[in-house]
């Protein structure tokens, strides 16, 4: 099974830590209300750092 990067936008508190740590994989929404995954199939090495530092734990890998 393949895995993909998931971010729960309803839980996101828009702290921007994932965007700062891993701009290859995350960006802020146009309104700045939450972060977004740029590419769910990313292989960026910084993703694990973003997952572990998210204060509301809303980023995870999911199985397809």
From Swiss-Prot:
PROSITE patterns: 4FE4S_FER_1, 4FE4S_FER_2. This is Ferredoxin-2. SUPFAM superfamilies: 4Fe-4S ferredoxins. Ferredoxins are iron-sulfur proteins that transfer electrons in a wide variety of metabolic reactions. It comes from Nitratidesulfovibrio vulgaris (strain DSM 19637 / Miyazaki F) (Desulfovibrio vulgaris). Keywords: 4Fe-4S, Electron transport, Iron, Iron-sulfur, Metal-binding, Repeat, Transport. Pfam families: Fer4_13 (PF13370). Homodimer.
